[in-house]
Amino acid sequence: DIALSPAGEELLQTVRSLDDIWNRFESAIDELKGLKRGKLRVALVTTAKYFLPRMLGSFCKRYPDIDLELEIANRENIVQRLRNNQDDLYVMSYPPDDLDIVRMPFLDNDYVVVAPAAHWAVGQQVSLPDLAAEPFLFREQGSGSRHAIDRHMNETGTQLKVRLSLASNEAIRDLVASGMGLAVLS
């Protein structure tokens, strides 16, 4: 028998709720724009590429006369696009507080520590301070993930050793699997 882990069960429930969330979002867009045809420019952080394409397929079927233009970049670049008002919709964590914008919570973005299968902490309940002596692989400065991790470390006074910074969650996962260090990913 194959069974999902508790984290897998949580992910499954989250994925199942994405369609409902997207339908509510589509209705909100309808109300805001009365949009039936034209172009919708969407800028999203790189981590949103894991769930947004499925939702966009549903949107395109519902609104075949609306062309989508996507910009996928790290948080820093998306914030700059927001400041320049380049797009119609922005998908990110932690939008800037200094802008007068409408914020619509979309989806919880939980972070987890990723470790090689044989690591001593696998299966254990540990906190980030417990892992302070371990080398970490982080997303690059300017990414939403790095922003969230840095913010958490500043709030808690936690210091982690950064062995390497990368712009790819996939590369980070592969390097973690090879034993190069731990990571905190969404």
Regions found by a protein language model. Name each.
Residues 5-8, 42, 82-83, 131, ...:
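Hydrophobic residues within well-ordered alpha-helices
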Residues 27, 33-63, 67-72, 76-80:
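N-terminal winged-helix
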